[in-house]
Curated annotation (Swiss-Prot):
This protein is encoded by the haplotype B genome of the allohexaploid Solanum demissum. Keywords: ATP-binding, Coiled coil, Cytoplasm, Hypersensitive response, Leucine-rich repeat, Membrane, Nucleotide-binding, Plant defense, Repeat. This is Putative late blight resistance protein homolog R1B-13. GO terms for molecular function: ADP binding; ATP binding. Residues 417-437 form a coiled coil. Confers resistance to late blight (Phytophthora infestans) races carrying the avirulence gene Avr1. Resistance proteins guard the plant against pathogens that contain an appropriate avirulence protein via an indirect interaction with this avirulence protein. That triggers a defense system including the hypersensitive response, which restricts the pathogen growth. It comes from the Eukaryota. GO terms for biological process: plant-type hypersensitive response. Residues 516-742 form the NB-ARC domain. Belongs to the disease resistance NB-LRR family. Its main location: cytoplasm. InterPro entries: Apaf_helical, LRR_dom_sf, NB-ARC, P-loop_NTPase, R1A-like_N, RX-like_CC. The gene is R1B-13.
Length: 1141
């Protein structure tokens, strides 16, 4: 019975659940020893194994094992050794091997190792003497694999009680592992490249086998270290010995033959075979890793350049499909082999002469090092370019060129120093893309014209070049690619873009483009919205609206259309506005888009210029009031059709309505809004139209027409198409977005790409992981994706949230899908939302294209490298604890941030923030910083001049003696201040001239403070006070003129007892909410006379407050005839009920 049987028996024993963890560790230790012994014994046919006592120590160890088993259980042990009995049977027969006896056996092993390690040395037997038929590259690699597998076991053990725990030597063992892996790859590389018989290179394979066996024997003899009482060598001495063994590359294998001589010989032979080995590829990152690992440092600038290029080559080859370099394999083989010859030759020259110069190297090798590096540069550039291109996102937005041009202007202004050496090239590229913009516009608006195929091909090429430009500029700013490579890359992009433009011109598509653009803009009647040709739905709605526009009342009428986002109200309005049968009935047509944030003057300019048919430049210096008067006079005698799109508030309509005179000539205004209240407010005669959802057949017709144009969908794809249309949940904008993505895919491959995985909302079928899914993975909720897409930012690959927690947990827990490892492969990820599914302990700083990132994080600080995400516009990080999260000052280098949400964060270095960081001019929402002092808040406000919404905690640990006015940005509209406990008075007055929403929580307040503060808040519409103490008198007096615009007042958990309100203090108040105001005596009687009041809610308050609320209701409804008024009483405070009972 051999040792292998014992090993097999031990492995099967590990399956027995009756063994304790200590027992299993003991068995694993024995297995570890036996695996090494087995491998050493396989080398018995080689003379070097006998010469260096490798066989002797192995045979002795086997005898120790045999004698130990026989001494413990003589009868059963013999049967076990012969293979007739299992270890499990031994256990069941209660012939137990105690831990003490095995502990003694371990000490015997250790002493035996010490005895042999004192005599062990590198074998001196010549390489020629070890040439035997058994040594093949496959055999060498198998031996190295066993050594690597066994050493990996030691590296991974972190349990201090384990017999294989060796913490002091892990670093050295990892070095040994790296040497063995690189040696194994070198063997594979040579064997894979040679066409000639492998036996011709046995010297190299023998050397590799001896080297691997020697270093493995050295490790085995010194590890694992037994208890300190039995250890002759200190851990530091063992570490030094292992380090010496790792440095074997500088030792001679035998007199006159060094390791480098052997490598040089095999590489020179290999170089001769390259022309005949064109079908075998050398483009593997492993061989480049070997060369990089072997580099000597400090010889010259040229050697530093060579090292840099080899590192770049290695890093990019990892991500490169070999098919993309099939025509350059011979060149790459030559480059890699030449680099290897150069590096290993340097060692020999360096060893013979201490003060080696560059001239010595060139003369000795016959090289001109600077000139020889040039071909390597060419290959490095080619590999980097191909590695980028093969990872380009396959969703190509035709609006991406607009996005790029905006970014280029932004780059040149913001990073002028970094881009100085590329300035001329970037300006040329910018000019070329501006010339091509009209062509792309036609591709978007006329996808089915006579140049359809050519236009699509050219457009895709242009967009790919745009991606490359962005990547190159980013790399320049981040210094990720050397300058020589960037310059060459941009020059190639210029030449390729010029070729694309020439191809377009050759087919006269540029002339057609210009004619089309002129036609589109020359006449109001020809104004066709982008989605006009897809109006295949809402036929009943269109007919209804057409009738309202052309018939009905003689007076002016407003046709209001309202719906949720994405239903197509803007497209529908544009369809009516550009309908010839409608437009021909009006003298003047004009339109404007209001949106949530608008400029009154810009709206007037847009309407006036449409009305008079002139450009806006000549009127830009005119005051807004004069423009409004000019527009009114222009419209007064004429019948007009006005389109006012995307109105968010009543006030926006109030700004414009005075410009539209009513002279009973059937003038019409089309108004679109998301809000029913706005639509109702703007209506005159006609009732607002609430736009319905799509019917299923309308969804399919839109998708089919958008994707296939005038063609019909093939039967093969129709089933997939119907399912896609259904999953878009009857939203036109969803359908158009999905259709645009499908157009960018090859239609024939839509089914096999499993495109449904992109958009399926409620359920995702678990599938095996594959490269194809990796490329297109998008776990997304369509609403959120749509909201992001319509904001104007390009969405590339998306890894988004999903509402099937079980699926995501299994997805993220599997070994092939570790989130931290897979994310770097999505190089072009723009949107990443992990907030609801997984807690992460890292920030994906290797994704520079991210625009949106949301996650739940475990750590208490953010790394400074987060500034690598310099394109980020939205950052949402939520912690798993209530501790303050430290934010590095480098966040202030992320100048594109518009939305920053990190609960309870504090700047890490306030001084650096003040002195060095730029302003975040684009930041509009900031939530939730923690400020210990008022001065900290002032500092943050100076760095964020354009805030519109701020939520923060101000602890105010240091208080000034008098009120301090804290000036907020002029644009600020929403402000929420809170503290954890109402222990002190708020130490500052709030000055925010345009503030509309204010919430204060956790402070002492008094009438004086509130009076002084509200003097700075004349536009306040919503005031909410939570957990507020009202000082010793518990009184709040509100005088006239303090809250002229307040509409909503909410008071919750206040200590307020006496509330005195002047008659006109809240002239337009609509809602009053009182929660848990148990000490308040009553609601002031002046609320009976507020005619705008619509709603009062009382919860957890005493009977007197409820009684006063009912009195107000009676007066409002009966006396004031306020039919819209509503009183809601949830419950009376519990102690009032007990007292009354």
């Amino acid at each position: 019975m051999t040792k292998r049987v014992i090993t097999d028996r031990l492995r099967s024993t590990l399956q027995d659940s009756n063994y304790s963890d200590v027992g299993r560790d003991l068995i694993n230790f024995i297995l570890w020893e036996l695996k090494f012994l087995d491998c050493f014994l396989h080398l018995k046919s080689l003379p070097f194994a006998s010469e260096c006592c490798m066989l002797d120590v192995s045979q002795k160890m086997i005898e120790i094992l045999k004698s130990r088993i026989l001494s413990i259980c003589p009868d059963s042990g013999i049967q076990l050794w012969k293979g007739n009995l299992s270890m499990k049977t031994l256990y069941l027969e209660d012939v137990r091997v105690t831990l003490d006896s095995f502990g003694y056996w371990k000490e015997v092993i250790w002493k035996t190792k010490q005895e042999f390690s004192a005599e062990y040395s590198f074998p001196n037997t010549s390489l020629a003497a070890n040439k035997v038929d058994d040594v093949s590259p496959k055999f060498v690699m198998e031996v190295i694999d066993v050594f690597v597998e066994n050493l990996n076991v030691v590296v991974k053990i972190n349990d201090p009680i384990s017999w294989l725990f060796v913490p002091e030597h892990k670093e050295q063992i990892e070095q040994v592992l790296k040497e063995l892996k690189l040696l194994r790859f070198f063997v594979w590389f040579v064997s894979n490249k040679y066409i000639e018989p492998q036996y011709q290179h046995t010297t190299f394979y023998i050397h590799a086998l001896i080297e691997a066996s020697h270093i493995s024997m050295a490790v085995w003899l010194h590890l694992p270290v037994c208890s300190k009482g039995n250890q002759n060598l200190a851990p530091s001495e063992v570490s030094r010995l292992l380090s010496d063994f790792v440095e074997m590359k500088i030792k001679a294998t035998e007199p006159g033959i060094s390791r480098n001589n052997i490598y040089i010989d095999v590489l020179q032979d290999l170089k001769l075979t390259i022309p005949q080995a064109q079908k075998k590829h050398a483009a593997e990152s492993g061989i480049v890793e070997i060369l990089t690992h072997s580099m000597m440092v400090g010889l010259s600038d040229q050697m530093a350049n060579l090292q840099e290029m080899l590192c770049l080559l290695r890093d990019n080859l990892i991500h490169l499909p070999i098919l993309d370099l099939e025509f350059h394999l011979q060149d790459m083989d030559s480059i890699i082999v030449d680099a290897g010859l150069l590096i290993y030759s340097l060692y020999d020259i360096k060893g013979e002469k201490e003060d080696t110069t560059l001239e010595d190297i060139n003369r000795e090798l016959g090289f001109d090092l600077p000139r020889n590096i040039e071909p390597i540069k060419v290959i490095v550039y080619l590999v980097m370019q191909k590695a980028f291109q093969c990872n380009l996102p396959r969703i190509h937005g035709l609006g991406y060129v607009d996005f790029l041009l905006k970014n280029l202007k932004d780059f040149q202004g913001r990073y002028s120093d970094s881009l100085a050496f590329l300035k001329n090239q970037i300006q040329v590229i910018q000019m070329e893309f501006e010339i091509l913009q009209p062509f792309l516009k036609v591709v978007v608006e006329e996808p089915h014209n006579k140049f359809k195929r050519l236009n699509e091909d050219c457009a895709i090429q242009i967009i790919r070049k745009a991606h490359e430009v962005e990547y190159v500029v980013d790399a320049c700013i981040n210094k990720g690619i050397p300058h020589w490579c960037l310059e060459r890359w941009l020059q190639d992009i210029i030449e390729e873009t010029t070729c694309i433009k020439a191809k377009i011109q050759e087919k006269n598509t540029v002339e057609d483009t210009m004619k089309t653009v002129i036609t589109h803009t020359s006449s109001q009647l020809a104004r066709t919205p982008r989605m006009n040709e897809e109006i295949v739905w809402f036929k009943d709605v269109i007919e209804n609206l057409r009738n309202r526009l052309l018939n009905g009342t003689k007076g002016q009428d407003v046709i209001s259309i309202h719906s949720m986002p994405g239903l197509g109200k803007t497209t529908l309005a544009n369809r009516l506005y550009s309908d010839r049968s409608i437009v021909s009935q009006f003298d003047i047509c004009a339109q404007c888009c209001v949106s949530q944030v608008y400029s009154y003057k810009e709206l007037l300019l847009a309407l006036l210029c449409d009305a008079i048919g002139e450009g806006s430049d000549q009127h830009r210096e005119i005051h807004a009031n004069e423009l409004a008067d000019m527009l009114r006079k222009t419209l007064l005698p004429r019948r007009y059709l006005i389109l006012v799109d995307d109105v968010w508030e009543n006030s926006a309509w109030d700004d414009l309505r005075g410009c539209f005179p009513d002279v009973n000539n059937r003038s019409r205004i089309i108004l679109t809004t998301r809000h029913h209240e706005v639509a109702k407010y703007a209506s005159v005669h006609s009732e607002p139209l609430h736009l319905r959802m799509f019917e299923e057949d309308e969804s399919w017709k839109l998708l089919e027409k958008r994707v296939f144009g005038e063609e019909s969908c093939s039967p093969l794809l129709k089933d997939v198409g119907l399912r896609i249309a259904k999953m878009c949940r009857q939203l036109p904008l969803s359908i158009v977005l999905v259709a645009d993505v499908l157009l960018d895919f090859c239609k024939e491959r839509a089914a096999e790409e499993n495109f449904l995985l992109w958009i399926k909302r409620d359920q995702i079928t678990k599938a095996a992981y594959s490269h194809k899914q990796h490329t297109h993975l998008a776990l997304t909720e369509m609403d959120t994706l749509l909201e992001w897409s319509t904001s104007g930012s390009l969405v590339g690959s998306v890894l988004f949230k999903n509402y099937d927690p079980y699926f995501v947990r299994s997805l993220l827990s599997s070994h092939a899908f570790e989130i931290s490892h897979i994310l770097p492969h999505f190089k072009f990820l723009k949107v990443l939302d992990l907030e609801h599914q997984v807690v992460i302990d890292f920030i994906p700083t290797e994704l520079p294209y991210l625009r949106y990132f949301s996650a739940l994080i475990h750590q208490n600080s953010i790394p400074s490298s987060i500034s690598n995400l310099w394109n980020l516009e939205t950052l949402i990080l939520k912690g798993t604890s209530a501790k303050t999260l430290l934010l590095p000052s480098t966040v202030w280098d992320m100048v594109k941030l518009g939305y920053l949400y990190i609960p309870n964060f504090s700047p890490e270095n306030k001084k650096a923030l003040l002195e060095n960081s730029p302003k975040l001019d684009d930041l509009e929402t900031l939530s939730n910083p923690y400020f210990a002092r008022v001065e900290d808040a002032e500092l943050m406000l100076r760095k964020t001049p354009n805030l519109r919404k701020l939520i923060c905690e101000v602890e105010c640990l240091e208080y000034p003696h008098q009120y301090h006015v804290l000036n907020f940005p002029v644009q600020l509209e929403i402000l929420k201040f809170y503290r954890s406990k109402a222990s002190k008075t708020i130490p500052f007055c709030i000055s925010a001239p345009n503030l509309k929403y204010l919430k204060l929580s956790g402070y002492y307040l008094d009438s004086q403070y509130l009076s002084e503060t509200v003097d700075h808040l004349k536009h306040l519409e919503v005031l909410k006070l939570y957990n507020v103490e009202f000082g010793d008198y518990r009184e709040w007096e509100v005088s006239n003129g303090k809250f002229p615009q307040l509409k909503i007042l909410k008071l919750e958990n206040l200590s307020l007892m006496k509330w005195i309100v002047a008659d006109d203090a809240f002239p337009i108040l609509e809602q009053l909410v009182l929660h848990d105001c148990r000490d308040l005596m009553e609601i002031p009687s002046c609320f009976m006379d507020i005619l705008s009041l619509k709603y009062i809610e009382v919860d957890m308050s005493n009977k007197s407050v409820v009684k006063s609320a009912k009195n107000i209701e009676e007066t409002q409804v009966e006396d004031n005839q306020n039919t819209n008024f509503k009183l809601v009483i949830i419950k009376v405070h519990y102690w009032e009920k007990l007292y009354s009972a």
